[in-house]
């Protein structure tokens, strides 16, 4: 059996960070995910999916994501229930994120620098958005933000990314496209 969810969408509001009585960080947020089809009016509808992330990734989500940020979530579906104030059973279905990927550079969210954070508990070496060409991959489980920031201080700030958005349209013809 398998319980696996992969989502890409935008946060509908800033993440909420709380701590359990034992001091464990937990962040909750809602992701707006567009459907792949259009309705009768030709518009794409969206699903609003509640997500929860625990421990250090929760703190990173709260620190680096905000309303409108694009994020990728890899996790599982969980349904829990509790007794509400009126005595009725309340069921909650949410995504428990095992990994949260920040899919936009920090400077598009009001921050600065490269987006070299890889969220989650996995030890993969995927980088999303940072300009790390020619650097050796690190196996730090996604928690090397401080180390990466100190490494970036040793380099002069140059933008060698030909795909960086400087607000100008890209001059390309259809003949240049491979499809």
Curated annotation (Swiss-Prot):
One of its GO terms (molecular function) is single-stranded DNA binding. InterPro entries: NA-bd_OB-fold, Primosome_PriB/ssb, ssDNA-bd. Keywords: DNA damage, DNA recombination, DNA repair, DNA replication, DNA-binding. Residues 103-179 are annotated as: Disordered. GO terms for cellular component: nucleoid. The keyword DNA repair applies. GO terms for biological process: DNA recombination; DNA repair; DNA replication. A motif (Important for interaction with partner proteins) lies at residues 174-179. SUPFAM superfamilies: Nucleic acid-binding proteins. Residues 2-104 form the SSB domain. Residues 115-130, 145-161 have a biased composition (Low complexity). The keyword DNA damage applies. NCBIfam families: ssb. Plays an important role in DNA replication, recombination and repair. Binds to ssDNA and to an array of partner proteins to recruit them to their sites of action during DNA metabolism. PANTHER family: SINGLE-STRANDED DNA-BINDING PROTEIN (PTHR10302:SF27). Homotetramer. This is Single-stranded DNA-binding protein 1. It comes from Listeria innocua serovar 6a (strain ATCC BAA-680 / CLIP 11262). The gene is ssb1.
């Amino acid at each position: 059996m398998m319980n696996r969810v992969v989502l890409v969408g935008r946060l509908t509001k800033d993440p909420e960070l709380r701590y359990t009585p034992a001091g464990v960080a937990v962040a909750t947020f809602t992701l707006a995910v567009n459907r792949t089809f259009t309705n009768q009016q030709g518009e794409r509808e969206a699903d609003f999916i509640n997500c929860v992330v625990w421990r250090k990734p929760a703190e990173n989500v709260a620190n680096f994501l905000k309303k409108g940020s694009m994020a990728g979530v890899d996790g599982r579906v969980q349904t829990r229930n509790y007794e509400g104030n009126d005595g009725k059973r309340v069921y909650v279905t949410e995504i428990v994120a095992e990994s949260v990927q920040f899919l936009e550079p920090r400077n598009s969210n009001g921050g600065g620098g490269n987006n070299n954070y890889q969220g989650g508990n996995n030890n993969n070496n995927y980088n999303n958005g940072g300009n790390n060409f020619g650097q050796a991959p690190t196996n730090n489980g996604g928690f090397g933000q401080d180390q990466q920031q100190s490494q970036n201080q040793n380099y002069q700030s140059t933008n060698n990314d030909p795909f960086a958005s400087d607000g100008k349209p890209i001059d390309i013809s259809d003949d240049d496209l491979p499809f």
